[in-house]
């Protein structure tokens, strides 16, 4: 029998103050997964965060410049023709509008492209048709990513009732989680060496390379080498982009 959402399940568990104060990205992820699974019957999370200004272009470009993590089923991910954002109407709607979007909203169907309709068929095949996407924002209220919450065993009407009544609480929990998770997780992805992070920190403060080299007791050539390595590790085409990512992902 499907376990139904209960409104009372959301009363206390969505308090952002309950999020652990930890720098361990895996521990934080497991906490969110267990909390939503135990109390809300959410099974499967997708997380995406990217620096503001990087949102233009195709989803393939965006996801390459972002950090993301998911607990969606492996067979579902392998069946996708592209990455998780490819032809995902709900996810792209959230990233464009900043509005909560239900995966199974019937009003969305007429607006979908052929590829997006094919994605819906794939979702149904892998029992991924019920869920919702939530946006995350910068302090200036610009969209910088979001979460997908997949409910495997939920009745759509019950799930919609919970989203309608508690989307604000869920949104606050996810937003606060992002603030605590983004830095620790980004560090596991970019793996900057201490000197590379230090160089980016000086650049973020507006310091020129020559002065930076003097400050660190290094040659300009060595500093340039650190900058090049930092660009590569952060998948940045320029040093300015690497600095922007370092600031956004709390690496400096």
Specify the residue positions occupied by each region the protein language model found.
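Short alpha-helical "packing" element that flanks the helix-turn-helix/winged-helix DNA-binding module
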Residues: 196-203, 242
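Signal-transducing coiled-coil linker helices
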Residues: 17-31
């Amino acid at each position: 029998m499907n376990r139904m959402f209960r409104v009372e399940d959301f009363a206390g568990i969505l308090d952002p103050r309950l999020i652990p104060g930890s720098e361990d990205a895996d521990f934080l992820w497991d906490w969110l997964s267990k909390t939503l699974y135990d109390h809300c019957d959410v099974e499967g999370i997708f997380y995406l965060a990217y620096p503001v200004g990087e949102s233009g272009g195709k989803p393939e470009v965006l996801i390459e410049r972002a950090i993301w993590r998911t607990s969606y089923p492996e067979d579902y991910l392998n069946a996708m023709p592209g990455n998780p954002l490819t032809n995902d109407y709900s996810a792209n709607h959230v990233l464009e509008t900043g509005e909560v979007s239900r995966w199974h909203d019937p009003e969305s169907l007429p607006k979908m492209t052929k590829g997006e309709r094919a994605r819906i068929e794939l979702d149904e095949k892998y029992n991924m048709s019920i869920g919702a996407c939530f946006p995350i924002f910068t302090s200036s209220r610009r969209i910088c990513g979001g979460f997908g919450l997949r409910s495997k065993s939920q009745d759509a009407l019950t799930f919609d009732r919970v989203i309608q009544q508690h989307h604000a609480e869920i949104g606050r929990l996810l937003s606060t989680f992002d603030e605590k998770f983004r830095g620790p997780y980004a560090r596991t992805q970019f793996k900057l060496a201490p000197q590379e992070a230090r160089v980016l920190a000086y650049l973020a403060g507006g310091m020129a390379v020559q002065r930076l080299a003097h400050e660190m007791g290094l040659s300009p050539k060595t500093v340039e080498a650190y900058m090049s390595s930092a660009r590569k590790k952060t998948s940045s085409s320029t040093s300015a982009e690497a600095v922007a990512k370092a600031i956004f992902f709390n690496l400096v």
